[in-house]
Structure formats: C-alpha cells, structure tokens
Regions:
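Glycine-rich phosphate/ribose-binding loops and adjacent secondary-structure elements
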Residues: 1-89
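C-terminal extensions of enzymes
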Residues: 90-159
Length: 159
C-alpha cells in the first residue's frame, strides 16, 4: 500500500528469480525485507538483489540441533571428532560463547550429549551473533564499495 513503511516478502525456497521481477518495482526509499531466508549464501544473494533486511529461524533452529555457523563453514558439534576438541567453536568469533566464556567444542558437544538445555542456548547465541556480525560486515563492505569482494571471499571459504 502507499502508506506502507516497508516491503516484505519471502519464504523458504531456493529460487531468487522472484526478486528480479519484484525488487525493481519497490520504492527505493523504503526498507526491503525478505522473510524466511537465513543461509549465508542466501543472504549474499538477497543483498546483491537489493534486499535490506532478513529474518529467519535458521540461526536458532540449527543451534538447538547442534549445527553451528563459523567463519570456515558449518560445524555439526555432534560429530565424534569434537569430543576432546579444546578449540572454541570459531576462533575468529568475538561472541560470549567463543571469546568470553571460552566454551570449547568438546565442552559444547558434551552439553549436547548430556541433553543439557544450555547447549542449545549457547549454540543459538553463537549463531545469532555470527549472522549479526556477518550483516555488519556486509553493511561495511557496501559502504566501502567492496561488497562483491566480500561475497566472493565469504562464499569461497565456505565450500
């Protein structure tokens, strides 16, 4: 509607073709919000097509199931190889889990194994921080005219 403060649309599909036809018709002076899109690759595609904000359950849902997002890619903390791993979830992360409480991969894995509810909270907290930090990096890269370079770096490090 003409009085709308923003435009929003979305859903969990893998096709972004709709953005190519919808975004050119949205007002440029209002935020463009995409719903249900929360994977790293999808955020970069959305931003490259003119989307400003996103929301999705991915960071918390995946966290509750022991899937963590890191600068090197996704990590499933349930795998046995993390049993005695003393490293933080992500050595490049400054979140409370990684940098302040210094919860190791082994400790977090054990919390999940013990069915301790704190495990899902810690993993979700880390994931939300990861995505907030990623979006801050994207905003800075756009302001500095290096979004394409950041996208190439981040996506190549995840393969």
């Amino acid at each position: 509607s003409p009085r709308s403060a923003a435009s929003s649309f979305g859903g969990e599909g893998r096709s972004f073709a709709e953005l190519d036809w919808v975004v050119p018709h949205l007002p440029e002076n209002k935020p463009r919000h995409l719903l249900g899109i929360g994977l790293v690759e999808d955020l970069f595609i959305g931003v490259s097509k003119g989307i400003d904000t996103f929301d999705c359950v991915v960071p918390t849902r995946e966290g509750r199931h022991g899937n963590l997002y890191t600068s090197a890619g996704e990590l499933n903390i349930h795998k046995g190889l993390y049993r005695d791993d003393p490293r933080p979830v992500d050595s490049e992360c400054a979140c409370e889990v990684c940098a302040v409480k210094k919860i190791s991969r082994g400790q977090l894995r054990q919390l999940f194994k013990d069915k301790n509810r704190t495990a899902g909270y810690l993993a979700s907290f880390h994931n939300v921080y990861f995505f907030n930090n990623l979006m801050a990096q994207i905003r800075q890269a756009i302001a500095e005219g290096r979004f394409e370079k950041l996208m190439a770096e981040k996506l190549s490090s995840r393969s």
